[in-house]
Amino acid sequence: MKVSKYVAIFFFVFIQLISVGKVFANADEWMTTFRENIAQTWQQPEHYDLYIPAITWHARFAYDKEKTDRYNERPWGGGFGQSRWDEKGNWHGLYAMAFKDSWNKWEPIAGYGWESTWRPLADENFHLGLGFTAGVTARDNWNYIPLPVLLPLASVGYGPATFQMTYIPGTYNNGNVYFAWMRFQF
């Protein structure tokens, strides 16, 4: 009984190590694709984009009412970017935006976004997207130290107008913010 228990543990650990090796082998390939997509979006943009922040919403279940009553949820600001659609119909974008944060202080953000895009209707202009953004932001309450961000993206669009959004996870009274903006392609 003891021997079979140790054999089972050995095989479990061995399989995990093989899996980790495959993940790291694929990580190089993934990082190469990531860099190539950023470079192609920078060097060969199809569109230039105007970003207009629309709403921030602090999840009420994750905040004291006194805090949410004081927070800014109208993120005035704007941004500019460039983007392209790849051969699979997925969206790639490089952007820079500045907006008023929860404390009504300016917050810049710049980065790369990618969304897998679906066109579920007969009208090809309507599109839905799910993906991520990776970039850098800086906040007043962190003395504008550059902070890396990796966040989910989702969107609903028609033609050149897209309502794009993310969710910033967090803890109680911190993070847990829905942030959305309009993106217009030219």
Swiss-Prot record:
Gene3D superfamilies: 2.40.160.20
Top-rank taxon: Bacteria
Subcellular location: Cell outer membrane
Transferase as UniProt keyword: yes
Site residues by UniProt (Role in lipopolysaccharide recognition): K67
Annotated positions for site Role in the phospholipid gating: Y172
Coiled coil regions in record: none
Parts of the chain that traverse the membrane: none
Catalytic activity: lipid A (E. coli) + a 1-hexadecanoyl-2-acyl-sn-glycero-3-phosphocholine = hepta-acyl lipid A (E. coli) + a 2-acyl-sn-glycero-3-phosphocholine; lipid IIA + a 1-hexadecanoyl-2-acyl-sn-glycero-3-phosphocholine = lipid IIB + a 2-acyl-sn-glycero-3-phosphocholine; lipid IVA (E. coli) + a 1-hexadecanoyl-2-acyl-sn-glycero-3-phosphocholine = lipid IVB (E. coli) + a 2-acyl-sn-glycero-3-phosphocholine
GO molecular function, one term: O-palmitoyltransferase activity
Disulfide bond residue pairs: none
GO CC aspect terms: cell outer membrane
InterPro entries with a match to the protein in the record: LipidA_acyl_PagP, OMP/PagP_b-brl
Signal peptide bounds: 1-25
UniProt family annotation: Belongs to the lipid A palmitoyltransferase family.
Self-association state and partner proteins as the record states: Homodimer.
NCBIfam families named among the record's database cross-references: PRK11045.1 (NF008271)
General function of this protein: Transfers a palmitate residue from the sn-1 position of a phospholipid to the N-linked hydroxymyristate on the proximal unit of lipid A or its precursors.
Descriptive protein name: Lipid A palmitoyltransferase PagP
Source organism of the structure: Escherichia coli O6:K15:H31 (strain 536 / UPEC)
